[in-house]
Amino acid sequence: MGLFDRKEKYIRINPNRSVRNGVDQQVPEVPDELFAKCPGCKQAIYQKDLGQAKICPNCSYTFRISAKERLDLTVDEGSFHELFTGIETKNPLNFPGYMEKLATTKEKTGLDEAVVTGVATIKGQKTALAIMDSNFIMASMGTVVGEKITKLFEHAIEEKLPVVIFTASGGARMQEGIMSLMQMAKISAAVKRHSNAGLLYLTVLTDPTTGGVTASFAMEGDIILAEPQTLIGFAGRRVIENTVRETLPDDFQKAEFLQEHGFVDAIVKRTELADTIATLLSFHGGVQ
């Protein structure tokens, strides 16, 4: 065949059908979510083997989980009362495609926004609680996220409650521009008022916690916990390396690296978080 000769058409084969002994058979399909590839050991893991906590049985890699899954793992059954629902996200900059992206994400996740806020008990200890969900536009911080978390702190001050926040974020939401950035100062001011009231604020850093969330309320907790191998940082690794013109350590911006350098108080396995949080709340006058 010459270099520019037209190739013969390929025969198209249906991958879900098989012919054996002249009989056309339908091949059973494997469900898409039956297995998960572990980012840690790179192995294909049977979903059921991950368990409720979503931890790799081979290398103990901690998978990302949704806000609902986090609630099921952390709070006492039936104790969670959600607050500040129905706050609508706007498009202050008329950013193209933003509202469509929000609508698609809401339908896919079943969430109204990237954070779930409310009040619950953890092993009998009552607390105000916020859980960020990376499935919602990478839990980016926009005006509604800022408003819900600020209102949670204000509610906690009124009710004299501690605050526990599970952070996870790619940073400020670019579609909202400066309106998203101002949430850093807004939430930080609420954290300060809560602290002035003599109340405990505890953060749990989960993968990933980056950008403006790291630069504000994520690192302002009286006690800062983190899940193993959590990515924690402000700017990205490549940006930092290009700025300082140095090669960074392999574990740079990992929870273990930050604990070694004094930025994280303790690294706690996901299966032990509820007990650890409850113990800390009880030490600091938690409400029964």
Model-derived features: where do they sit?
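Short cysteine-rich clusters marking metal-coordination/redox-active sites
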Residues: C38-C41, C56-C59
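Short, intrinsically disordered, charge-biased short linear motifs at domain edges
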Residues: G22-E29, G40-Q47
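Long, charge-rich boundary regions
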Residues: A67-A139
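Residues immediately within or flanking Cys/His clusters that coordinate Zn2+
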Residues: F35, A53
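Cleft-lining beta-strand/loop regions that shape enzyme active-site pockets
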Residues: V116, T121-S195, L202
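Conserved catalytic cores of soluble enzyme domains
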Residues: G170-Q288
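Short Cys/His-rich "knuckle" micro-motifs
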Residues: Q47-G51, R64-R70
